[in-house]
Curated annotation (Swiss-Prot):
Annotated InterPro entries: FAD-bd_PCMH, FAD-bd_PCMH-like_sf, FAD-bd_PCMH_sub1, FAD-bd_PCMH_sub2, MurB, MurB_C, MurB_C_sf, Oxid_FAD_bind_N
Enzyme superclass (EC): oxidoreductase
Name of the protein in question: UDP-N-acetylenolpyruvoylglucosamine reductase
Predominant localisation class: cytoplasm
Top-level taxon in the UniProt lineage: Bacteria
Keyword Oxidoreductase included in the entry's annotation: yes
UniProt cross-references to NCBIfam families, sorted A to Z: murB, PRK13905.1
Domain FAD-binding PCMH-type: residue ranges: 22-187
GO terms of biological process kind: cell division; cell wall organization; peptidoglycan biosynthetic process; regulation of cell shape
Protein location: Cytoplasm
The EC number(s) this enzyme carries: 1.3.1.98
One Gene Ontology term, aspect cellular component: cytosol
Amino acid sequence: MTNAFPFSVQESVPLNRFSTFRIGGPARYFKELVSVDEALKVFSFLHTSPIPYIIIGKGSNCLFHDQGFNGLVLYNNIQGQTFLSDTQIKVLSGVSFSLLGRQLSSKGFSGLEFAVGIPGTVGGAVFMNAGTALANTASSLVSVEIIDHAGNLLSLSREELLFSYRTSPFQKKTAFIVSATFQLTRDSQAAQRAKALIEERILKQPYEYPSVGCIFRNPEGVSAGALIDQAGLKGLTIGGGQISQKHGNFIINTGNASAADVLELIETIQKTLKQQGIALEKEVRIIPFQPNLGVS
């Protein structure tokens, strides 16, 4: 069936290798993207193809099904960055967001210190508008380059894009994020701030276990982790999945967790909080085995 593609693909690739949860069955088809030209060819084909597909980066916000994904998984590994001016940088979407924040802050550039410790790619950070209480990806964003649903390469300015808390316009449209351009400032204290941020993350978050970071978006004015803690759910274990004792909004893989274990924990949290009149919205992307079921 791989001859259905005008480019090389792999078959039956385990997705647990491409998730920070270390959970997931095999992708029916798998393609690593390493250049913009290659991505343009792939999306030009997919525009006219019925084959379902998903795009992943570091897999740091995805829970894959135990059976895997019955379609094509595109792994974004497009690397590179260029300074357009003294304080403006264009970064390709497969670059590690955390590494970018660390490198820039160590060189005295401010604007992306908050990225240190966020385990996704630049593309994933734009897609989720990743951030902290201090800043988010859109804060320093100048423009985004995308390949649209028809396979066209477009550049969109920040002013054309509506971002909000953990939300970007790309969550509701079919587009591949190619690059992001960020506006930085010179600041000799940037490295010190980045160091303090990562130390705080290590102190408060369970980095010693596989996870995908925060499972739920914070409701307005309150921490989802604090609500889960107050509900007495920290430490709850189902199979190999556990609500972290360290941070209530983290579910960790203690060894052999399945997607079913994690989904049951998510459902338990939501049901418990709903009884208190609180509706928690998932931040993690649940990737179904059958693509026609949609992505929640």
